[in-house]
Design a protein with these regions (language model features):
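Conserved N-terminal beta1-alpha1 strand-loop-helix module at the mouth
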Residues: 1-185
């Protein structure tokens, strides 16, 4: 459904979460996607060997590191797949995050998946990153406020398009993707 509505990346959570999927479930979904939809695995503090094992089994094309992974892990994983490093924002962003060895950085709320937004101005110096992905409390209605501050490379949504935890709502997803497509313009 998400790809048909215009999403160009789909996330598969492999960390303990109400949205967690097994590698075989992700692989079954990934096989139904078109060739240009990114298949992103979300991991929290998993050893690089385990991440790569799951990535192969699930057919992933990118990795999102959402824990306290040391830079060395990201550097090792980048030899195999693109890496997105997620940081949790509970106040103004740390400019040092720009130095983390990742292909993109993602900024999420203090409690990922909670739907609780943060202040867009907290992103401050991160707007200079060419591949800034913004997440955290996003909804179709909130995208306009975000775009007033800057134009991220991408936006990432989960709870903002759900009818209940882990259940995507087609109407909310469609509205979000339409608002996202209008962009910063």
């Amino acid at each position: 459904m998400a790809e048909r509505l215009g999403a160009w990346a789909l996330g598969f959570v492999f960390a303990p979460s109400k949205r967690r999927v097994e590698p075989d479930q992700a692989a079954a979904i990934a096989r139904r996607l078109g060739p240009f939809a990114a298949r992103v695995g979300v991991f929290v503090d998993s050893e690089p060997e385990e991440v790569l094992r799951v990535a192969r089994r699930a057919g992933l094309t990118a990795l999102q590191l959402h824990g306290s992974e040391p830079p060395e892990w990201a550097a090792a994983l980048r030899r195999h797949l693109p890496v997105i490093k997620a940081f949790r924002l509970s106040g103004p962003a740390d400019p040092a995050w720009l130095e983390y060895p990742a292909d993109a950085i993602l900024v999420d709320g203090a409690t990922p998946g909670s739907g609780k937004p943060y202040q867009p101005e907290w992103l401050g110096p991160l707007w200079s990153h060419p591949r800034l992905i913004v997440a955290g409390g996003l909804t179709a209605e909130r995208l306009g406020e975000l775009y007033a501050y800057g134009c991220p490379y991408a936006v990432d949504v989960s709870s903002g398009v759900e009818s209940s935890p882990g259940r995507k709502d087609a109407q909310k997803l469609k509205a979000f993707l339409q608002a996202s497509a209008r962009g910063c313009g």
